[in-house]
Amino acid sequence: MSCCASSAAIMVAEGGQASPASEELWLASRDLGGGLRQTELSVPNAYCGTCIATIEGALRAKPEVERARVNLSSRRVSIVWKEEVGGRRTNPCDFLHAIAERGYQTHLFSPGEEEGDDLLKQLILAVAVSGFAATNIMLLSVSVWSGADAATRDLFHWISALIAGPALIYAGRFFYKSAWNAIRHGRTNMDVPIALAVSLSYGMSLHETIGHGEHAWFDASVTLLFFLLIGRTLDHMMRGRARTAISGLARLSPRGATVVHPDGSREYRAVDEINPGDRLIVAAGERVPVDGRVLSGTSDLDRSVVNGESSPTVVTTGDTVQAGTLNLTGPLTLEATAAARDSFIAEIIGLMEAAEGGRARYRRIADRAARYYSPAVHLLALLTFVGWMLVEGDVRHAMLVAVAVLIITCPCALGLAVPVVQVVAAGRLFQGGVMVKDGSAMERLAEIDTVLLDKTGTLTIGKPRLVNAHEISPGRLATAAAIAVHSRHPIAVAIQNSAGAASPIAGDIREIPGAGIEVKTEDGVYRLGSRDFAVGGSGPDGRQSEAILSLDFRELACFRFEDQPRPASRESIEALGRLGIATGILSGDRAPVVAALASSLGISNWYAELSPREKVQVCAAAAEAGHKALVVGDGINDAPVLRAAHVSMAPATAADVGRQAADFVFMHEPLSAVPFAIETSRHAGQLIRQNFALAIGYNVIAVPIAILGYATPLVAAVAMSSSSLVVVFNALRLKRSLAAGRGATPGTLIHSGAVTS
Amino acid sequence: MNTLIYLIPVALSLGGLGLVAFLWALKSGQYEDLDGASWRILDDGDGEGESSQTL
């Protein structure tokens, strides 16, 4: 209970700062037909039954919500909602607010990101079928080993054959397909010895059964398949999923814009048909379609696409604007200076397509091992066969021993060695609030020696936050929120989030770009905005850090905002230092701001005023100097470097594109997620190497036994199972060390932000 | 030998029953939320009656 009782005021602000736009939520929801849509939100702070009841209750109270169900294992809530209620189009942001009001953080996760896929279902089915076959055949085999007489033994062998045959075809098809693919292209992989061992042992056993032989390997071939399928299924769960970062980015460029002809007539044209020199009108709330120059109008522009900074810049006649930036407050008339394909967003897309740095070149540990393993195994089996032919000259016996060698060396433990550790490590990371996209990312993270961090949104929270809410009376805050509803300015959004749900104020509303909002009501003229605008006098601070609410130029309240550093930043940087990792800052922001933050965090290596391209260059330079860098960033401007880096990480508050491009996403606020993820990955890497050592050690003992012909089916069954079990138990040690290591880094993560009241 | 004639089918069908039960559980989403299920058992629903609804 206590873990859920969190201070609503703080959490609302947190929930709000992460809230994606309504438009993004619509696009990310899945159409179920019949006017219903489904949205998946992640709720990293949900921990217990009360959380389930609270969140589901809050959502079900809304008329738009058809069904809501919290999944505590994946920390997600799935909401099925109606597109329209009473003729009003549903705003999915209301769900985020409803959850945030109860004190929970929410992040959007687009469907494709973690959806269970068909192949995984098929693999689980295959595991179930092979498990069924393995247990039943083992039952019969135990009877045979206990000394069933000849006729009974034959019967048991035949029944085993009947069970094993279909099971091998059904469950073994994954290995056969993959092995066939490899052979057809003249390569060999881990699946070739598997497919060979399984089918050869089945064939030999069938031959033995027909000839009333004593030894049959049906149990070995099916058990082998069972263990390997478990490894394959776990491995599949850790595979990287298709990244849609680039398509997400393309969504940021509008499809078209209104072009004004010299004669004054207007025409809506597709973005590709806009030529340099055309005059365009960009209304408030629209994205700039192509790079251009402002001809007339004043507005606040959200340039986070370009420099990652959330505070809008005021643009006026003569300023240049980049494609993809969002026009927040006033209409602008632009002159296009570049065609869409030469514009800023197109450049970022190009950079991202080009940037496939360490990721593409990296070969996974298991693949590297397989490259040496399978030829060695084949050679060994062949030599055994030849050797026994020379010694005895009995084809049948030589074949039996060779098959035994293949079965014994089959990479059972090896196939489990990596995926089990990675699944356990991913589970541990998830408990600490870090999501892993794929297993190779963890292997890469264990190798890094440098961390490059973005500033805004990564080292800092990145959004203005109301810091003096306790000084302001709730009534004033509600009034301000009612006015702020009319604006998209981040300050206005911050006020709305602090006040919770607000109904818009009635009256004559006007938004003055670069200044604030004015509402003429019966009580008088309310103004919310800069001090200069609201009360007609300049204040001590700049406009960004405060907003004034006034009635007829009398100050009613002063709201102060700050972009706070992310919690535990300093401790995390120190922890990275202790791990022997160098840190640096890559920022698009102005040099003095970056320098101040860098010195307060004790980081000497920093770069400021970097464009997305320059960020990639800094990262590439580090790679050329032999460093393996982890890049932590959140903005769209970071997306290319996130992709180019050896491995990358993004906070869940990051832009959709940034989240998609990163290998890891951390859901809680403190930056300690970064050292925590690195430590866990390194620990996992250690366990993987231990597991390899165990698997190789097993082979060193078992292979001579098999080559000498002492590996009966009983010996094979015992050896294979025990080696697999040892590997699995070794991997589970990682889970135990979670309990022990909780005091160190992840402790601060577990209940971050959930302030007990 | 005679007992085997019915014992083996019994053993196999019991195993098959387990397989079918597992597949059913998988398909009906019993493994979707292992952590949540243990908490939901304590939820008395407070008259909403919706808590048992599956998606």
Curated annotation (Swiss-Prot), chain B:
The chain crosses the membrane at residues 4-24. It comes from Rhizobium meliloti (strain 1021) (Ensifer meliloti). The keyword DNA damage does not apply. Keywords: Cell membrane, Membrane, Nitrogen fixation, Plasmid, Transmembrane, Transmembrane helix. InterPro entries: Cyt_oxidase_maturation_cbb3. One of its GO terms (cellular component) is plasma membrane. This is Nitrogen fixation protein FixS. PANTHER family: FIXS PROTEIN. The four proteins FixG, FixH, FixI, and FixS may participate in a membrane-bound complex coupling the FixI cation pump with a redox process catalyzed by FixG. It is found in: Cell membrane. GO terms for biological process: nitrogen fixation. Its main location: membrane.
